[in-house]
Every structure is written in C-alpha cells, then in structure tokens.
From Swiss-Prot:
Lineage: Eukaryota, Fungi, Dikarya, Ascomycota, Pezizomycotina
Name of the encoding gene: lcl3
Entry similarity comment: Belongs to the LCL3 family.
Biased composition, class Polar residues, residue ranges: 15-27
SUPFAM superfamilies the record matches: Staphylococcal nuclease
Molecular-function annotations in GO: endonuclease activity; metal ion binding
Domain of life according to the entry: Eukaryota
Pfam family, one: SNase
Protein name: Probable endonuclease lcl3
Length: 271
C-alpha cells in the first residue's frame, strides 16, 4: 500500500522530467558548442583577461626602479606617497597604484610603512626633472648658500604627501627622472616650477641628461622672473650680510658649483 502522505507520484514525475532533459553522455560534445555554453565561456575568459590586464596596467605596485619596464618611460605616471626628502631636488616615493580608490591607507594590508627598515627596497628614488637645487654638504664638499632653505622648502611641500610623477628615464644613479605634481587644496602644482618661482633652484644646465618634457620655456621664464624679482638665492644681501662678508657678486649656480668641485678633484688625481 502506498503511504498517503508521501507524495511519491509528484516526486517520481519530477525526477522523470529531470532525467528526460539531462543530456546523455554521448550528447556532451554538442552541448559544449551550444550558444549559451559558448557565451558563458567567452564572458568568463574576457573578464579574466580584462582583470589581469587591469591589475598589471593600473594596480600592480612598482617597489623599485628595477621593476619599471622600459616601455613605461615617457608613457606612464606613478602615484604614491613621499616617504623622505634626501636633497633639495630628489626624494623617495612609495608607489600606491590606484590611491585611496584602491584602498591604500584604508585597508589593513595596504598601509604605507613608516619604519625605515620596512621601506628598504620598497621605494623609488625620484629626481625632479628640469631643475637643479643648491647642494647640501656631502662627500667632503661645503654646502651651497640657500641649500638648507631649498631642502626645508621641499620637505614642507611634499613630505608625507601624495604626488604624481610623470617618469622620463632612469639616470646613472638609478634614480627616476620625473616631472612631479602635488595637490595643495584644489590646485595641482608642478614641484619643479614652484621651486624656480621661489628662487630655490635653477633650470638644469648639464650638457647631457636634461629632461623638460614640454615645459622648458616655462621653466626658463620662471627662473628669469625669480632673478628679476630678487627672490630666494637671487636676493641681494642685506647691509648686515655684506658687513658679515657675504659675497656681493651673483650667486654660484648648482651647475657651476659642481663643475668647480669636479675640476678641483681632477687636479688632485695623480697622473
């Protein structure tokens, strides 16, 4: 006797329908080329390839200059946070692709390190393109006038801030030469241009390695205006400074300073 509440007839009919619509083992090849199967497979493949490409193009972090592909130069920009300012025209950048939109600074696994040991081999050494700032004391050379002021000015402008670097090339010191922008309030500022306007840098004058992008004329005009306005290193010494022995002639440019020291060091070498 059939159990009155079992519903066996309904379950049996449902099972029969499922088996009737299920493909037989011999039908699998034809099932794989059905439009709905092909569309689903194509959609999965396209989304996977697009995701990988999106990651490699926009979200892959570049820890050091050795990880920059040659075809990136003059085509890509790098967004990140300045972790240190070593000199008046270069700094260290921790690359944060995608910025806050990608979770940097917000998600626990996307925190920017603060300890020096955690930043080892994790930052890019950026050289600001198109400008040359007064040299700090190093390698036994004396500091140039206004080198500390220029260094302090750059620290105040970019240290611990997010910047975007439009990368041009890798130089002989494994630095990335780049035009750098920083946002202050609602405005985006060209760091090199602002240094020239403040009279704390000159246009880069080396015979080789100069990089300006499309702004060389603008940079030269900014330097000339700073000279004419007597700001920064171009300011005339006060009476007190002159009495204290400050030079009254035009200041030595960073390029002249380097040339003078390089010539003196060559004379010291034997032979």
């Amino acid at each position: 006797m059939r159990w009155p509440w079992s519903g066996d007839d309904h379950e049996q009919n449902k099972s029969s329908r499922l088996w009737a619509t299920s493909p037989k083992s011999s039908d699998w090849p034809s099932t794989l080329v059905e439009p709905r199967t092909l569309i689903a497979t194509l959609a999965l493949t396209v989304s996977t390839v697009a995701g990988v490409r999106l990651y490699k193009t926009y979200l892959r972090r570049i820890p050091t200059v050795n990880h920059i592909k040659p075809n990136y130069f003059r085509r890509k920009s790098l967004f990140g946070q300045v972790t240190s300012v070593g000199d008046a025209d270069n700094f260290r950048l921790y690359h944060t692709p995608g910025g806050r939109i990608a979770g940097w600074g917000l998600l626990p696994w996307k925190r920017i390190p603060t300890k020096r040991e955690d930043l080892t081999k994790q930052t890019l050494h950026i050289r600001i393109a198109g400008v040359d700032a007064p040299e700090l004391a190093h390698w036994g050379r004396e500091a140039q006038p206004f080198s500390k002021e220029a260094h302090d000015w750059l620290i105040n402008l970019i240290h611990n801030r997010r910047v975007r670097a439009y990368i041009y090339r890798r130089d002989q010191y494994d630095r990335v030469v780049a035009q750098v922008y920083v946002r202050r309030w609602l405005f985006r500022k060209d760091v090199g241009l602002e240094m020239l306007r403040a009279g704390l840098a000159t246009v880069y004058e080396a015979k080789t390695g100069a990089e300006f992008g499309t702004v060389e004329d603008k940079y030269r005009a900014a330097e000339q205006k700073a000279r004419d306005s007597k700001v920064g290193m171009w300011a005339k010494p006060t009476l007190r400074q002159r009495l204290g022995g400050a030079p009254t002639q035009p200041p030595e440019s960073p390029r002249e300073y380097k040339n003078r020291h390089n010539a003196a060091e060559k004379l010291k070498k034997p032979g």
